[in-house]
């Protein structure tokens, strides 16, 4: 009886089959975001090529994505403007959350360079995009009554040792009449 089969191994867990390395969740999301942006450029009127894309086109894309948002952002004239938990529904629009837009821009910025775009011409890192994201963050924070202030690092405050006044320090450092410089160092007195 032949124990070794001469047929190809059909076991999916076998080490003889080559499987492509599984991509991380981040890489998959980055690829989907990149494909969505490229499709947006193709559907743009007139169609845009990637090298001709600028920060203004990225802003158009972000505004386009706003229609698919799920975050309620109150208008300034809404009665619930500035309330973190409004007590009733209102007609204010649903928008993309700032955190989602910020993460999206980060992924697209990386994807642009991975797909051959020069870092110095990256439209996702343009000043206009950075300013837009900052404005969205600040407005959404005001609309919800939440602040996004940067947390400052805590300074490790140790209680400073009290030091004698400068004149007293200088007097202690000068050798007394008849003492050597080493007398203060060793703690010996003459």
From Swiss-Prot:
UniProt xrefs under Pfam families: ALOG_dom
Q: In which tissues is it expressed?
A: Expressed in hypocotyls, shoot apices and lateral root primordia and, weakly, in vascular tissues.
Query: Which GO MF terms are attached to this record?
Result: DNA binding
Instruction: Give me the ranges of the annotated region Disordered.
Output: 1-28, 145-190
> Where is there biased composition of kind Polar residues?
1-26, 180-190
Q: Where is the composition biased (Low complexity)?
A: 158-179
InterPro entries for this protein: ALOG, ALOG_dom
Cellular component terms, GO, for this chain's entry?
nucleus
For the ALOG domain, which residue ranges apply?
A: 25-152
What does the record list as GO biological process? mRNA transcription; post-embryonic plant morphogenesis; response to blue light; response to far red light; response to light stimulus; response to red light; unidimensional cell growth
Question: In terms of domain of life, where is this protein from?
Answer: Eukaryota
Q: Where is this motif: Nuclear localization signal?
A: 150-154
Q: Where in the cell is it found?
A: Nucleus
Alphabetized UniProt keyword annotations:
Developmental protein, DNA-binding, Nucleus, Transcription, Transcription regulation
Q: Where primarily located? A: nucleus
To which protein family does this belong? Belongs to the plant homeotic and developmental regulators ALOG protein family.
Q: Which PANTHER family match?
A: PROTEIN G1-LIKE2, PROTEIN LIGHT-DEPENDENT SHORT HYPOCOTYLS 1
Main role? Answer: Probable transcription regulator that acts as a developmental regulator by promoting cell growth in response to continuous red (cR), far-red (cFR) and blue (cB) light in a phytochrome-dependent manner, at least during seedling development.
User: Would you tell me the protein name for this molecule?
Assistant: Protein LIGHT-DEPENDENT SHORT HYPOCOTYLS 1
Specify the taxonomic lineage. Answer: Eukaryota, Viridiplantae, Streptophyta, Embryophyta, Tracheophyta
Its gene name is LSH1
């Amino acid at each position: 009886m032949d124990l070794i089969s001469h047929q190809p191994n059909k076991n999916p867990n076998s080490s003889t089959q080559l499987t492509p390395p599984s991509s991380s969740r981040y890489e998959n999301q980055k690829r989907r975001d990149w494909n969505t942006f490229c499709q947006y450029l193709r559907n743009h009127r007139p169609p845009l090529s990637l090298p001709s894309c600028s920060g203004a086109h990225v802003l158009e894309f972000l505004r386009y994505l706003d229609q698919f948002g799920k975050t309620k952002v109150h208008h300034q004239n809404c009665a619930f403007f500035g309330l973190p938990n409004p007590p009733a529904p209102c007609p204010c629009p649903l928008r993309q959350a700032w955190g989602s837009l910020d993460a999206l821009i980060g992924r697209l910025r990386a994807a642009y360079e991975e797909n051959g775009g020069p870092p110095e011409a990256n439209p996702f890192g343009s000043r206009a995009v950075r300013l837009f994201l900052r404005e969205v963050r600040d407005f959404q924070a005001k609309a919800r009554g939440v602040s996004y202030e940067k947390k400052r690092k805590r300074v490790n405050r140790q209680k400073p040792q009290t030091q004698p006044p400068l004149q007293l320090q200088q007097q202690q450092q000068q050798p007394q009449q008849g003492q050597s410089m080493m007398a203060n160092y060793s703690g010996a007195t003459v």
